[in-house]
C-alpha cells in the first residue's frame, strides 16, 4: 500500500 509520504531528500 502506498500512503502519502514526505518528500525524499535528493
Curated annotation (Swiss-Prot):
It comes from the Eukaryota. One of its GO terms (cellular component) is extracellular region. It is found in: Secreted. Expressed by the venom gland. The modification Pyrrolidone carboxylic acid is found at residue 1. Signal peptide: none annotated. One of its GO terms (molecular function) is peptidase inhibitor activity. GO terms for biological process: regulation of blood pressure. Keywords: Hypotensive agent, Metalloenzyme inhibitor, Metalloprotease inhibitor, Protease inhibitor, Pyrrolidone carboxylic acid, Secreted, Toxin. Belongs to the bradykinin-potentiating peptide family. This peptide evokes slight hypotension (-2 mmHg), when injected alone into rats. It has no bradykinin-potentiating effect, when 60 nmol of BPP-10d are coinjected with 0.5 ug of bradykinin into rats. It inhibits angiotensin converting enzyme (ACE) activity with a K(i)app of 9.12 uM. This is Bradykinin-potentiating peptide 10d.
Amino acid at each position: 500500500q502506498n500512503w502519502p509520504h514526505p518528500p525524499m531528500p535528493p
